[in-house]
């Protein structure tokens, strides 16, 4: 009985927090638009029964989503942002995870804390901080002007560049942590064996380290995408 309760609890949690809200959203998606509160007219009524619901059931809302150009542009734009952001996050996150895995063991908890610590603050505060960094009067433009790399402030806010920066910053730990976990468990003797067999450090990295860390890469890409 105790074992049953231990197994049933997570399923009940899943039912309450995921399946029931999903069923509510599905019900709304099959409803008709109405100028009311809430702004839809449910097709299902307990008084009329399931038969009346099935006789009136249509997927007009879903057909509209697949035929309207506005939604297609939104879908494609979302996929583009997700793909580019995932690629950038991987390129930035892998070297960080590799450096953490190769750092002395006494340093690793501190490095892990530095990765996680910023995300203990409110997301809203971090958004305002990035606005202060990326605005035309922000720190980034001030540094670039001081270095003489630009003559006029760059416009970064309200552009796709700002979107990519925000997405990469937000999801970077979700890329770093799985890759770090995979690299930390890797047997260092495999690298030594590859070098003994004639591989250079770079060749051993591409032929041994990257393949062995592939599960972490895949997990990180799934989490970020």
Feature-to-residue mapping (PLM):
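N-terminal signal-anchor/first transmembrane alpha helix
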Residues: 1-28, 99, 109, 113
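Transmembrane alpha-helices
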Residues: 9, 113, 117, 169, ...
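Short membrane-interfacial helix/loop motifs at transmembrane-helix boundaries
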Residues: 19-69, 137-138
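Membrane-embedded alpha-helices of multi-pass transport/permease systems
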Residues: 19-30, 91-95, 124-128, 137, ...
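Transmembrane alpha-helix signature in integral membrane proteins
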Residues: 69-99
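Membrane-helix interface segments
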Residues: 103-111, 139-140, 159, 189, ...
């Amino acid at each position: 009985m105790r074992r049953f309760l231990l197994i049933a609890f997570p399923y009940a949690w899943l039912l309450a927090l995921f399946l029931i809200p999903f069923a509510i959203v599905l019900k709304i998606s099959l409803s008709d638009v109405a100028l009311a509160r809430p702004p839809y007219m449910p097709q299902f009524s307990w008084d009329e029964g399931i038969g009346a619901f099935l006789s009136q059931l249509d997927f007009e809302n879903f057909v509209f989503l697949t035929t309207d150009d506005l939604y297609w542009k939104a879908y494609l734009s979302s996929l583009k942002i997700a793909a580019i952001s995932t690629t950038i996050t991987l390129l930035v996150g892998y070297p960080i995870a590799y450096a953490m895995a190769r750092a002395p063991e006494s340093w690793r908890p501190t490095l892990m804390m530095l990765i996680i610590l910023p995300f203990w603050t409110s997301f809203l505060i971090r958004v305002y901080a990035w606005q202060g960094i990326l605005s035309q009067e922000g720190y980034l433009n001030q540094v670039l002007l001081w270095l003489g790399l630009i003559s006029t402030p760059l416009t970064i806010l309200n552009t796709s560049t700002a979107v990519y920066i925000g997405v990469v910053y937000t999801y970077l730990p979700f890329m770093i942590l799985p890759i770090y976990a995979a690299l930390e468990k890797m047997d260092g003797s495999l690298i030594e064996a590859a070098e003994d067999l004639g591989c250079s450090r770079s060749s051993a990295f591409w032929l041994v380290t990257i393949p062995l860390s592939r599960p972490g890469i895949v997990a990180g890409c799934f989490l970020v995408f």
